[in-house]
């Protein structure tokens, strides 16, 4: 839960890598209380944000990136294409 600013993502990704986890899941499908704060499914409804954040995760980490999309959208193909364009592994 960080702002959509590259430097913030770069910092948090370093912390995530330090945990030695196996990958990153971008939960852009979370509808519960996050969309009101500009996170979760709010980001997942804007393909440009999906592509941008996914790209940052790929650029600033060595881990695979999984993008969890929101079903609360008219056409899931747009966010799916954005995730792919950003370099998502799944």
Regions found by a protein language model. Name each.
Residues 4-90:
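Alpha/beta enzyme core
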């Amino acid at each position: 839960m960080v702002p959509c600013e590259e430097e913030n993502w770069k910092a948090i990704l370093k912390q995530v890598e330090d945990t030695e986890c196996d990958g990153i899941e971008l939960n852009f499908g979370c509808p519960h209380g996050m969309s009101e704060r500009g996170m979760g499914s709010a980001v997942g409804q804007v393909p440009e944000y999906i592509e941008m954040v996914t790209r940052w995760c790929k650029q600033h980490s060595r881990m695979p990136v999984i993008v969890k999309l929101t079903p609360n959208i008219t056409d899931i193909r747009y966010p799916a294409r954005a995730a792919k364009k950003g370099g998502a592994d799944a």
